[in-house]
Amino acid sequence: MVSVGKKAPDFEMAGFYKGEFKTFRLSEYLGKWVVLCFYPGDFTFVUATEVSAVAEKYPEFQKLGVEVLSVSVDSVFVHKMWNDNELSKMVEGGIPFPMLSDGGGNVGTLYGVYDPEAGVENRGRFLIDPDGIIQGYEVLILPVGRNVSETLRQIQAFQLVRETKGAEVAPSGWKPGKKTLKPGPGLVGNVYKEWSVKEAFED
């Protein structure tokens, strides 16, 4: 079973990407941040909103040095049909990242998101750092979509912690430009002096 702070299981899957069918390995992305998104199925309702929303924000992921990989049990042929016939009408240019095929749910099982009774992946999102370590993940039931803006915010927070080697940490609701906390003996019992609850909700 996967866990934060542990190595993300490697995999190899066929995928549809920029009009071509290719093979992708997670280990090929070492040295980069990766958002690995599992979703239930092509030509479904919430999935269309999620995948297109990630595509719309893809330039922002790229600015942060992040690669995106989407995964479902659908074949690469169905991925192509979905992109060409629906998703390309929702976001200009269609999907700009690989759409991977996990037929049988083997990779989803490795990541704990495959539902063998339903035969689909649950909505799992894994944030993987350049060392291949899982920094965070979220798994939702099928009818509820994920928040892409929150994914971007969390990546920025993880990058802050990585860049400062833990000398600074990100409090609730932190965004770039907002106050961080610096762990140390002097902060014990004194967080209220450095941070107020309203800061969690300020833009």
Curated annotation (Swiss-Prot):
Domain Thioredoxin: 2-160
Catalytic machinery residues: 47
Origin superkingdom: Bacteria
Keywords: Antioxidant, Oxidoreductase, Peroxidase, Redox-active center, Selenocysteine
Alphabetized Gene3D superfamilies for the sequence: Glutaredoxin
Catalysed reactions, semicolon-separated: a hydroperoxide + [thioredoxin]-dithiol = an alcohol + [thioredoxin]-disulfide + H2O
CDD domains hit by this protein: PRX_Typ2cys (cd03015)
PROSITE patterns linked to this entry: THIOREDOXIN_2 (PS51352)
InterPro entries assigned to the protein according to its UniProt record, in alphabetical order: AhpC/TSA, Peroxiredoxin, Peroxiredoxin_AhpC-typ, Peroxiredoxin_C, Thioredoxin-like_sf, Thioredoxin_domain
SUPFAM superfamilies: Thioredoxin-like (SSF52833)
GO molecular function: thioredoxin peroxidase activity
Sequence similarity: Belongs to the peroxiredoxin family. AhpC/Prx1 subfamily.
Protein name: Selenocysteine-containing peroxiredoxin PrxU
Organism: Peptoclostridium acidaminophilum
Gene this chain is encoded by: prxU
